[in-house]
Each structure stands twice: as structure tokens, then as C-alpha cells.
Swiss-Prot record:
Record topology, Cytoplasmic segments: 1-8, 98-117
Gene: yidI
Protein name according to UniProt: Inner membrane protein YidI
The keyword Transferase is annotated on this UniProt entry: no
Subcellular location, record wording: Cell inner membrane
Source organism per UniProt: Escherichia coli (strain K12)
InterPro entries per the UniProt record, alphabetical: Uncharacterised_IM_YidI (IPR016512)
Regions of this protein lying in the Periplasmic compartment: 32-77, 141-149
Membrane association type: Multi-pass membrane protein
Transmembrane parts of this sequence: 9-31, 78-97, 118-140
Length: 149
């Protein structure tokens, strides 16, 4: 317990970084947690029903009532943003711990956990970009009748 008491900032950075990394891995493995977005057909059906109700109310001379829908909380976006914020907080704690001349293992632990979390998110984003580019090439190749080679 004495080591943690001497290295409060870097130990806090390791805790932030470890929580952020676990959140990122669990969210990637078991997510998405929010409800899927509505389909295009349901959006069009809702809009046409609203137009029909508005036209009928206008013809009858009634007052048109509009219902404002609340936007749902996007749990996935909150998890991603909070994980990145915790990783940045871990890197800041590592920097402050280094300025305070705390123990190296605590500083390096905070750097590894915080940097690992940011690298994990960057790697996932990069894989998504590469896969989307390959998919576009595959679609163009299929449409033009050419080969990928």
C-alpha cells in the first residue's frame, strides 16, 4: 500500500487506463448495446402517416398537432467517448506522474494502458477503413466485369 501512496497520480493513471482498455475490449466483443436504427421503410411510413394526418386535420379545419420525438441515448457512443476520455486521462496522469518524479513502473503502466486503449481504437478504425476500401474495389470490379488482379 505504501507504493500506491507514494505514486498516487501514476497509479490513478493505471487505473483509468485499465478501465478504459477493459471497456473498449468488452464493448468490441459484446456490443453494440443500443437499439438498431429504424429502417428506411419505417421512416417513410411514419412521415407519410404524419402528412396524411396533417392533410385530414387541415381539411376538417382542426388544429394540427405535432409530436416531438425524444432522441434515444446512444449507449455505444457514450461507451466509446468515455473510454477515449479515460485513456487520455491516463496519459495525462502518466505525464503528471513523470513530472512529479514518481516510480517508473507506475508511469509506464499508465502509458501502456492509456496508449494501448487509444491504439486499440485506432486499429479498429483503420481496419474498418481498409475493409471499406476493399469492398468499394470489389463492387467496382464486379460492376465493370474486370478482375481484381
Amino acid at each position: 500500500m505504501g507504493i500506491i501512496a507514494q505514486n498516487k497520480i501514476s497509479s490513478l493513471g493505471m487505473l483509468f487506463g485499465a478501465i478504459a482498455l477493459m471497456m473498449g475490449i468488452i464493448h468490441f466483443s459484446f456490443g453494440p448495446f443500443s437499439a438498431p436504427p429504424p429502417t428506411f421503410e419505417s421512416i417513410v411510413a411514419d412521415k407519410t402517416a404524419e402528412i396524411k394526418r396533417g392533410l385530414l386535420a387541415g381539411i376538417k379545419g382542426e388544429k394540427i398537432t405535432t409530436v416531438e420525438k425524444k432522441e434515444d441515448v446512444d449507449v455505444d457512443k457514450i461507451l466509446n467517448q468515455s473510454g477515449i476520455a479515460l485513456a487520455i486521462a491516463a496519459l495525462l496522469c502518466a505525464f503528471i506522474g513523470g513530472m512529479r518524479k514518481e516510480n517508473r513502473w507506475g508511469i509506464r503502466g499508465a502509458l501502456v494502458f492509456g496508449g494501448g486503449t487509444l491504439a486499440f481504437h485506432t486499429l479498429l478504425f483503420g481496419i474498418g477503413i481498409v475493409c471499406s476500401i476493399l469492398l468499394i474495389f470489389l463492387i467496382f470490379s464486379f460492376l465493370t466485369g474486370g478482375s481484381l488482379v
